[in-house]
Swiss-Prot record:
Monomer. The record marks 75 as: Plays an important role in discriminating NADH against NADPH. It comes from Shewanella piezotolerans (strain WP3 / JCM 13877). Coiled coil: none annotated. Involved in the final reduction of the elongation cycle of fatty acid synthesis (FAS II). Catalyzes the reduction of a carbon-carbon double bond in an enoyl moiety that is covalently linked to an acyl carrier protein (ACP). NCBIfam families: EnoyACPredFabV, PRK13656.1. It comes from the Bacteria. This is Enoyl-[acyl-carrier-protein] reductase [NADH]. Pfam families: Eno-Rase_FAD_bd, Eno-Rase_NADH_b, Enoyl_reductase. NAD(+) binds at residues 48-53, 74-75, 111-112, 139-140, 244, 273-275. It catalyses: a 2,3-saturated acyl-[ACP] + NAD(+) = a (2E)-enoyl-[ACP] + NADH + H(+). The active site is at 235 (proton donor).
């Protein structure tokens, strides 16, 4: 079929398999260009490995450290009438390139919140790897099916206490709007913590530990974002922030357990990037377009893959073997460049000035849109989008 982008809300409902493969290859090449990671991990489980920071973690482990990787994700293959999800094609491309270099790669396509996902991962680790020395937890899901009761719990992207009003961009119409979001109820806050908090990370680590598949010295990391006062009302001080604070709680509990065998658990606070997850958060697209322009001008711009490479080589797996620098809450901070005062001051100055007319001039909004489409395999140089492509891509994946 000939596949063109179709946007609905903050999701592109079509994907291009050749474009997704090109994205993965680009990340692999960036990783290889940085050279091998000294003392890097060798057997890595990535929970949430099909896009964004999770995909970049799998790529960095494999192509920066020659690691065997097991990826867990929830994606859809193509049907007769529509292409598969971007994460399906990303994972297929990763599998193809990893195997071409003789690297172990297996994937599990299922609900990562389920008991079955954990049991299947343990089974494959025991059969193929013995143990893992790194576990990356990178799930971003709006819904969690509780594994025992089967109840569906939904997260909310809402402020707490009072309505949130702010300048934002309507990414469908490309105009500046005043966004208004009603505050979360107590139930919505609790539900967001249930979906996006640290409980499932703990359940994964507990299951892996009880099965004896965590190597001594195993490191685990989960991803978070804190941001600044520009995004705090909707993010860190909102329902999502409460969930991310619960991730901090889980990290401390896990670190206490893992440190007994020389391991560690950390939350890594990462910079804002264009992902399917961030595009759903009110105000984030405008903030990202603004902060990217300034960071590019200062030579500080990083995408997912650059961030994760820096986390591996300059935090968790330093060449000299020294311990990672952490903040007062034992977090790895990779948002350090974004939070520089001159970067944030620029955004504070720009915010009241931006209009629909000067949006493209004052910010990198055009680039934001291009990067958003790239997530789904579109707008990539060198690809002929008039070509007929086969949307049916198979790879080494266990679907349960």
């Amino acid at each position: 079929m000939i596949i063109k982008p179709r946007i609905r809300g903050f999701i592109c409902t079509t994907t291009h398999p050749v474009g997704c493969e090109a994205n993965v290859l680009e990340q692999i090449n960036i990783t290889k260009a940085k050279g091998k990671i000294a003392n890097g991990p060798k057997k890595v489980l990535v929970v949430g490995s099909s896009s964004g920071y999770g995909l970049s973690s799998r790529i960095t482990a494999a192509f920066g450290s020659d690691a065997a990787t097991l990826g867990v994700f929830f994606e859809k293959p193509s049907s007769e009438t529509k292409p598969g999800t971007a994460g399906w094609y990303n994972s297929a491309a990763f599998d193809k390139f990893a195997k071409a270099e003789g690297l172990y790669s297996k994937s599990i396509n299922c609900d990562a919140f389920s008991h079955e996902a954990k049991q299947k991962a343990i089974e494959l680790i025991k059969e193929d790897l013995g143990q893992v020395d790194m576990v990356v937890y990178s799930l971003a899901s709006p819904v969690r099916k509780l594994p025992d009761s089967g109840e569906l719990i939904r997260s909310s992207l809402k402020p707490i206490g009072e309505p949130y009003k702010a300048t934002a961009v309507d990414t469908n119409k490309d105009i500046i709007i005043e966004a208004s979001v009603e505050p979360a109820t107590e139930q919505e806050i609790n539900d967001t913590v249930t979906v996006m908090g640290g409980e499932d990370w703990e359940l994964w680590m507990q299951a892996l530990a009880e099965a004896g598949v965590l190597a001594d010295g195993c490191k685990t990391v989960a991803y978070s974002y804190i941001g600044t006062e520009l995004t705090w009302p909707i993010y860190w001080h909102g329902a999502l922030g409460k969930a991310k604070m619960d991730l901090d709680r889980a990290a401390h509990a896990l670190d206490d357990k893992l440190s007994a065998t020389g391991g560690s658990a950390n939350v890594a606070v990462l910079k804002s990037v264009v992902t399917q997850a961030s595009s759903a958060i009110p105000v984030m697209p405008l903030y990202i377009a603004m902060v990217f322009k300034k960071m590019r001008a200062e030579g500080l711009h990083e995408g997912c893959i650059e961030q994760i490479n820096r986390m591996f080589s300059e935090r968790l797996y330093k060449a000299d073997g020294s311990a990672a620098e952490v903040d007062e809450s034992n977090r790895l901070r990779l948002d350090d460049w974004e939070l520089r005062e001159e970067i944030q001051q620029h955004c504070r100055d720009m915010w009241p000035q931006v209009t629909s007319e000067n949006l493209a001039e004052l910010t990198d909004y055009r680039e934001y849109k291009e990067e958003f489409l790239k997530l789904f395999g579109f707008g990539i140089e060198g690809i002929d989008y008039e070509q007929d492509v086969n949307p049916n891509v198979e790879f080494d994946v266990v679907s349960i």
